[in-house]
Structures are given as C-alpha cells and as structure tokens.
Amino acid sequence: MAGGYFHSIRLLRSQCQGCVTCVKACPTEAIRVRNGKAELIEARCIDCGECLRRCGYHAIVAETDKLEETEQFKYNIALPPPSLYAQFPPETSAAAIWEGLHRLGFDEIFDVAVASEYISLEIAAYLKNYNGGRKPLISCTCPAVLRLIQVKFPELIKQVVPVLPPTEAAAIYVKNEVMQRTGLKSEEIGVWFIAPCPSKNANIRQSVDVRHTQINGSLSISEIYGKILKIMGGEIQPDKKVTAGSSYGMSWGSYGGELEAAGIENGLAVHGINDVYDVLEQISLNKMRDVDYVESVSYTHLTLPTNS
C-alpha cells in the first residue's frame, strides 16, 4: 500500500505483455508501462476495475477474501447485493440462493436491499431539504466514484449526499441485532459482503465513506456464484435466518434503480466509469445545474477475475 491507500487491484508481471491496453483504459492515468511491464501508480488508482475488464492476458486480478476466513468467527452473516441474484437464471428462486449461502457456512443472510430501502428515504429527505446549494447532488454509494472525485474532482466533494452506503448501513444494523439476539460479542460475529467490483473490496479495508467499517471482509461475487451453483438443489431448510429486501431495495441493482427507489424524477443515472468521468467533468464546470441528483456507478457488468 503506497500513499496510505489500500488497493484490491493487482498486476501480475509474469502474465503482462506490455500491450498498454490497461494504460489506455484507466480513467485516472494510474498505470504506466516500464521495461515492457505494466506498473500501478497507487496514488491515482481508484479500484474501478476498468483495467481488469480490458486486459486480454489475465494479467490483472482483484483481491478478495477467502471463504475459509469465515471459520474464525462463531457466527457469520452474508450481505448479498441485488446484483448477486441477477447472476442466476430467472427460474432460480431467491430461496434456493439463500439455501446455497447457508450450505457455504453462513448462519444468517441479510439483503443489502433492505438497507437500500431506508437509505432511499434518507436521500429523498436530504434532497427535499437541500436549499441554496450547488447542484446536482451526487450519489455516495460507489467507492470508485468517491475515489474518482477525491483524485480528479475534489471540488465536488461537498455535492456528495452525506448518507451511509447501503452496504455499511446493513452491516451496522445486522451486527447490532445479532449481538442483542444471541449475546455474542462483536468480534465473534463475521459480516461478509458479496462484492460485485474491486472498489468495494478495497473500501472494506480502507473506507472512503466511513471511519470504521462493520464489515469483516468481502467475497467475490463470481466465486460465490460458482460455489452456489455446485451445491444447489435439495430441500430448503426453513429454520435459517433470512432478511429479504423488497422490490424497491432490489431496484438498486439495476440502471436507474436508485433514482426510482428514492422517488427522484429530475435525476440522471450514469453507469460505467468513463461515462461517470464525463458527467463529473460537466458538473465541475457547473453545466448541469438543472439536474437534482446523479446516480453514479463505476461498473456496467459484474463478472470479474479474482486472485482465487
């Protein structure tokens, strides 16, 4: 970790061909090629994963935690995002996915979508009471976008809505609830986010939005998806604890879902780090004053190579 910031993106020198595809893809110019190999300029990297998606030689991976690390806790909670459910065929029931997570060793499942519902209300209330400040306001939920603002557009930090991201809100609530219900101590409870992108992995280890995270680690969505597929089937156990989100919370996993859940009509949804960059540039030039809110997410698809 250089410059005081942890990164989940790792460059594998042995597989790098020096083709500069990653250099061209990086929105913050955080990669350079020296002596035929790509190198990361860590102070500029925002962990958006754009380099990872573009590399054709599998020379870039995203580091996540291993499922085996859950064994150090007495009680483990999975935080699945809406995007996990979207990986499965439409005929796959949520109950079947929950059962798969239980069989992987999780004692409880708490949908991030539940927290998204409450955060949507907070965003709507903040927007309603926001008077006289510069617009548009900007979504706080994507760590890569927050890092991009810090690195390239620091003047926009004051326009980021000051609410907890749903993942962190879910972790705080469910850990406290389990402590009260079971009598277990905080250090005996593991909270694991099933992460769809590298920036969320990095954010757990060194957060850009909270001082002390309640999330113990992240597990790659692609790895968990594969493991669930292998163990799916059989009888679903009814005695396991599941807190499921509604369609409003689940809508956060789709384009424009955050705007819809918060009831924002005069908003703009932007997905994909390059499009987000372009919009932030326009906002910094004060050219989007007529827009109330920008939903901004760095990724457009979710299957990422990992270090597994």
Regions found by a protein language model. Give the residues of each.
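Flanking helices and flexible, charged tails adjoining ferredoxin-like Fe-S electron-transfer domains
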Residues: 1-3, 52-136, 146, 159-164
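Iron-sulfur cluster-binding cysteine motifs and their immediate structural context
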Residues: 2-13, 17-42, 46, 50-66, ...
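Short acidic, glycine/serine/threonine-rich loops at helix termini
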Residues: 89-91, 121-124, 149-153, 202-208, ...
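Phosphate/adenylate-binding glycine loop and adjacent helical scaffold
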Residues: 197
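Conserved small/polar residues in nucleotide/adenosyl-binding loops
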Residues: 300-306
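Immediate flanking context of iron-sulfur cluster ligation sites
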Residues: 186-189, 283-298
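A conserved mid-domain beta-alpha-beta active-site/ligand-binding segment of alpha/beta enzyme cores
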Residues: 228-275
